[in-house]
Every structure is written in C-alpha cells, then in structure tokens.
Amino acid sequence: MSLLAMGKAAREASFELAVAATARKNQALLAMAEELELQQDVILAANAKDIEAGRSSGLTDAMLDRLLLNESRLAGIVADVRKVVTLDDPVGSEIDSRVLENGMRLSRRRVPIGVIGVIYEARPNVTIDIAALCLKTGNASILRGGRETFNSNMALVKVIQAALAKTGLPAASVQYIESPDRALVSELLTMDQYVDMIIPRGGANLHRLCKDQSTIPVIIGGFGVSHLYVDESADLIRAIDVIDNAKVQRPSACNSLDTLLLNEKIAAEIVPALVARMNQQKVTLVAEPKAFALLQAAGAEQLRAAGAEDFDTEWLSLTLGVKVVADVKAAIAHLQEHNACHSDAILTNDLKCAEYFINAAGSAAVYVNASTRFTDGAQFGLGAEVAVSTQKLHARGPMGLTELTSYKWIGQADYLSRS
C-alpha cells in the first residue's frame, strides 16, 4: 500500500474512531494487553534479533539500552496499557460553558485531533504507547520506527492488528510504515491533506528534519539538556542520592541528568561525597576549571576538562557535566544559555530561592528537591506518553490523553437567529 493510500485509510478510520464509545476503545486496549502477554516469546525473540544486529552495526550502549525489551520491560508496557484503560476518556468531556445574553448555551468539548503521524527511533515501546493513547482518544495513527527496531516493531504491530480485529475497530486505526526508505519520511511530513499532527521522537537531527520539512504542525520534544542545581541551603547528604538517581538510574533516558551545577559556597563541601559516589558508579565527569580542580583534588577517577560544546550535550550515557556557579541567578543564566527546555531541578531549603528557580527556568518540567527522572507519562499518572513536548504551543511536558485532543465550540439554542 502506498503512503498516500495509508493516509486516506487513516483519515477514514479516524471518522469511525471519533464516534467510538469509550467501552469499545477500552475493549481494544484490553485485547492489546492480552495479546502482548500471549505473544511475549515471539516479541522478545524478535527484539533479540534487533539487539544482535545493533551490536554488529556498532550501536552505542545507550542506543542498545533504548532498544532492549525484556520480560520486565514488556510487563511494564502491558501495565501501562491497562493503566490507560482505567483513565478517564477526555473525548466528549466539557471544558467549560456559559449561557449568552441571547439565550444560547455555548460550550467547549474535547474532540480527537484526527490522524497523528509519529516518527521515532530505537524505542520499540513507543509503538505500543502511541497506539494505546491514540486509540483511547479516538485518533488514527501512522507510525514510522527506526530500522534498528524493525523486527520488534513488526511483532508489536501484529499484536495491535490482532487486537483491532478482535474488537471490530478499523485496521487502519494503527498503521506502520514498513519500508526503511527515508524518502517516505519526507513524504509523510507533507501529507497535510490526511495527517493533522506530526510527533518526532528521537535525536536533534530528527527534530530538525521534521521542523524544516513538515507542512503539518510538529510537536518538538524529547531532546534537551537536563540540569540540577545544588543551592547553598541544600541538605548535602541527601543531595548525593538525588544526583545519583538522576544520573545513574537510566542514563539513556531523555530525562536523565546532563549537567550538575554547584553553588560555590558548598561546592568544596559536597565534592568529596559526590566523587566517591560517581567513582563507584563509573561516571565520567566533564568539568569547567573551578569544578575540575575540586574534583581532581577529591580523586575523581574519570575526569576531563569541558570543551566548548560539552554543556550543550545531552549525554544519554554515564557522563555528567559539572560546573560551579555563584548563586541561583547564575544557575538560571546557565540554563538559559544551554538549551534547558526539558527537565531541570533545584535542591534547596530556601523557599524564595525555589520559587525564583520555578519562575525563571524555561523548562517543560521543573522540580524542587526531586530527581529529573520523574518527567514521564507513567510517573505523572498519565498511563503512558506519546512524547515529552519541550515547546510552548499546544502541549508541554509528557503528552498523555488530554494532549491528544483538541476542542470544538458547541452552541445550543431554541431556533435562535442572529439579530
């Protein structure tokens, strides 16, 4: 089937999905969860082929980690799908209403966006996340995954199609572009007669491509340097655990810590404990001169001087930038200079300092006394996410069900004519 034919089929499917009852959509999601469990061995075997091919082609450890599916991760995906079933369906809900002077009742009601195109790289879980959230919100989707995940995605798409068949929803509700031809990405980006929104999930190059070529509204997200600032009033003992969690728990995640900013008044005090923990976790520290001297004196085992672009780098690995700053205003100045748009945090016991950071940071998600790792649909109680938007229009942060809807105005009256 040509891409244009897929677009037309998706548009037609979106009309049926828009009026599908919540119970019917939930039935499809439950069938999807059951099929994932039934086909676990097939899915993991397909993923093993992708992992083997990835190693042979020289993929980084960070990319391989994103690509990996195992029993635990698959169980998490199943749980996320079932969580989506329990969430309220935003479609049809009334946002607000009022009665005008002429007697008309005017309201805004949530509706599906229509057809959503999603282009993503080495994350097979995205296939299920997108399908589940789009189905729940009555949106048709056209998916294009990376070649690194081809076998995994083919197995997952079969699961989705089986669930759609069981529940009688259109097969074109969720479609996957199987061809690795990159020209199809450019074609998808210009199919504005059928596709209403494009969501890229991948690196900066993918986002730039979509932004430059698309004639369809694009949700930019996922990429961004995440920072954590340790204020002079912070509990330095407890701070080490938060820094460790933000950097080490899953370094390949887009919400993992990239740059640590230390207030100059506590830098010398916290560095020994920081170095001990980072040495233990095999983290490479990349530091500007003040931080470098302190880290070197404390015995940092993997340490190098920061280059011109290091503080603009999303590491996605066990590497951490470290810088000493004068105060919270200097920390904010650093954030503003270095692409802080995703997840940023402050550790402080000073409420005024915390409030200043919250208001001044331009990030999609800002944390006080917490790890950056919480920027996630499941952690936010959204069930899953289609993306983490770092732009300011339409949606921001983890995009769950509500962010996959628009609204329409509804006027109800008694045979009213305009005077």
Curated annotation (Swiss-Prot):
Q: Which SUPFAM superfamilies match?
A: ALDH-like
Which residues constitute the signal peptide according to the record? Answer: none
Q: Where in the cell is it found?
A: Cytoplasm
InterPro entries recorded:
Ald_DH/histidinol_DH, Ald_DH_C, Ald_DH_N, Aldehyde_DH_dom, Glu-5-SA_DH, GPR_dom
Report disulfide bridges, numbered on this chain.
Answer: none
- Family designation: Belongs to the gamma-glutamyl phosphate reductase family.
Which PANTHER family does the record associate with it?
DELTA-1-PYRROLINE-5-CARBOXYLATE SYNTHASE, GLUTAMATE SEMIALDEHYDE DEHYDROGENASE
Gene Ontology MF terms: glutamate-5-semialdehyde dehydrogenase activity; NADP binding
A single Gene Ontology CC annotation of this entry is: cytoplasm
What this protein is reported to do is described as: Catalyzes the NADPH-dependent reduction of L-glutamate 5-phosphate into L-glutamate 5-semialdehyde and phosphate. The product spontaneously undergoes cyclization to form 1-pyrroline-5-carboxylate.
Its keywords, alphabetically, are: Amino-acid biosynthesis, Cytoplasm, NADP, Oxidoreductase, Proline biosynthesis
Q: Spell out the reaction equation it catalyses.
A: L-glutamate 5-semialdehyde + phosphate + NADP(+) = L-glutamyl 5-phosphate + NADPH + H(+)
- Its EC number is 1.2.1.41
The alphabetized list of GO BP terms reads:
L-proline biosynthetic process
Q: Give the pathway listed in the UniProt entry for this protein.
A: Amino-acid biosynthesis; L-proline biosynthesis; L-glutamate 5-semialdehyde from L-glutamate: step 2/2
- Protein name according to UniProt: Gamma-glutamyl phosphate reductase
Its lineage opens with: Bacteria, Pseudomonadati, Pseudomonadota, Gammaproteobacteria, Aeromonadales
